[in-house]
């Protein structure tokens, strides 16, 4: 466990929350905007560096507040430019954050939980069990750390982080309030100013919270589908037993229709050799998604030890994609990035204190550091 100070962590407060905080300590609400800019635009964690605040206010803030992000354990850089940070959160567990540069975009993949309770059979994170929800400060803190690493100001045109996907460790909708607060900061011009179309939340299908999400925030939605029929999805994504496909897809349709503006649902489908990659599975997907505005992202399986699954051949992947194309769907195949530093989709594991198995040991599915020679470890921890 990481020791707490009892002070209010301003890093995870939205603008309205920060305004209320300043009112509670007898200060004007406009101070919230000043402090948010220092924190998120410039990566400042020292009140003394906030030059437009008077000394008395800086001293008051030092007495009752702090700006504290997760602790960086390691930062690895892949041969393809992908970066991965392993960060330690207050529970003592480690989670992972991945930055993927591609063309003129920079996508940050953010974790929402330490471990995951959903136990999807092909995902290394799920093999750890669940430890804890991340706080709002720990979720947005991953963006804060990455942005500081690049030394860029979010408002600039040449920003490093253009997109954020809640597709890291954990199920975001099972940490609803903290994830929503973090996404609000991401989209706030006083935070990171990221367009609502460029913030995406991925869910395995927590149906009640999909409806709640549509009421409070406008972000893009991705569904981790991975199977085109009930029996197979029950096997691969166990939450399907609680929220079957007809109920789940109806909720997704409601969400997309509320957004309007020609928004579509992203379907994520991990291809597993001999399991869900056959022509009949593609045909079933076409029928299943016939009346849903969507785009399909095929993800060839990224191996990890003892998974029991294999990546399909390139021919099998192309065949699956071609069938979906002929069925009228917009289909892409995700390029595997960061595989040499275990940063590819489905490989994020961190190090999680195993509470679901009621023991006091640590699960370490892999070493926190990459094997020698597999990646360049960054020396700059700022």
From Swiss-Prot:
It is an enzyme of class 2 (transferase). InterPro entries: Aldolase_TIM, Methyltransferase_A, RlmN_N, RNA_MTrfase_RlmN, rRNA_lsu_MTrfase_RlmN/Cfr, rSAM. It comes from the Bacteria. Residues 102-342 form the Radical SAM core domain. Its main location: cytoplasm. Gene3D superfamilies: 1.10.150.530, Aldolase class I. One of its GO terms (molecular function) is tRNA binding. The active site is at residues 96, 345. Belongs to the radical SAM superfamily. RlmN family. Reaction proceeds by a ping-pong mechanism involving intermediate methylation of a conserved cysteine residue. This is Dual-specificity RNA methyltransferase RlmN. It comes from Stutzerimonas stutzeri (strain A1501). The gene is rlmN.
